[in-house]
Amino acid sequence: KDELKQHDYSSDSLEIIHTPDSISMDESPKEAVVNKPNASVLVAASLVSNGKADALVSAGSTGSVVLSAAKHISRIPGVKRTAIATVYPTLNEFKRDDHLALMVDIGANVESSAKELVLFAIMGSTYVANVRGVGSPKSALLNIGEEETKGSEKMQTAYRMLKEVPSLNFSGNIEGKDILRGMADVIVTEGFVGNIVIKTLEGTAMAASHLGKLAFRARFSWKLGLFFLRKGLRRIREVTDYAEYGGAPLLGFEKMVIIAHGRSSAKAVSNAIKLAGKSVRDKVCETMAQKIGELDFQPK
């Protein structure tokens, strides 16, 4: 409250609820959720569950957010495993509606069944259509080859099932070399693979930035070249800055859950809240539930 007194805000639109505990980044999420029922993220999840809040936004540890949401917030009927999604910039070679693509899952689950991958595609496509405003978003299954017969039996089954979902604009398999080209709006994968892909992209961006700094110090001609490229480089930083996008949606609950980066700035948290608000206003979770309810199967 003392901190808020330094800022201009409407007290009618902000309620502060004190919590005696919090879950740190280095704690075991599973143990903390059990031993700290009054931790801030658990209290926030319970407020969403009982209708006193419409969405949950947290910059806490991913595990604690996922487990807190699972403890208090109901899943969409038919969804047994939720999934974390995140947007990432593409080259947009195919001039799609959005230069960003959504990857789902990026770590909520290590493995997923073929039917669960189908649900991830439906939830991801619904999110992109409603939140990003992409018309008929194209979804693709991350695999080791483009052909329908590529990959494990599970991936082949997922491919066949995805083709049969009327609400999906499924384009087939996509290989790792193509995910930055912008061939699809939604990339579906298991969490183990998705997490490695996203962190590899983050590491590549960091390496490119480091190489640019080395070049800037190495030669005057290179420094001059970077000077003329500064506007373009600034634009690249903007589209790769996680603060611009707020956070990663945790898909599969009846209420929207947004997981912000642990190092989120004020701008990132603000954008995460705006993202949650837009999701609520556009009834994203309700639309996901409707589309999943239209399926002829239930996940095992």
Question: Where do the language-model regions lie?
Answer:
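Conserved catalytic block of serine-dependent lipid acyl chemistry
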Residues: 191
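Anion-binding alpha/beta catalytic cores of soluble intermediary-metabolism enzymes, centered on
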Residues: 1-31, 50, 55-180, 194-269, ...
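Short, well-structured alpha-helical segments in soluble
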Residues: 36-52, 159
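Flexible, acidic glycine-rich loops studded with aromatic residues
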Residues: 282
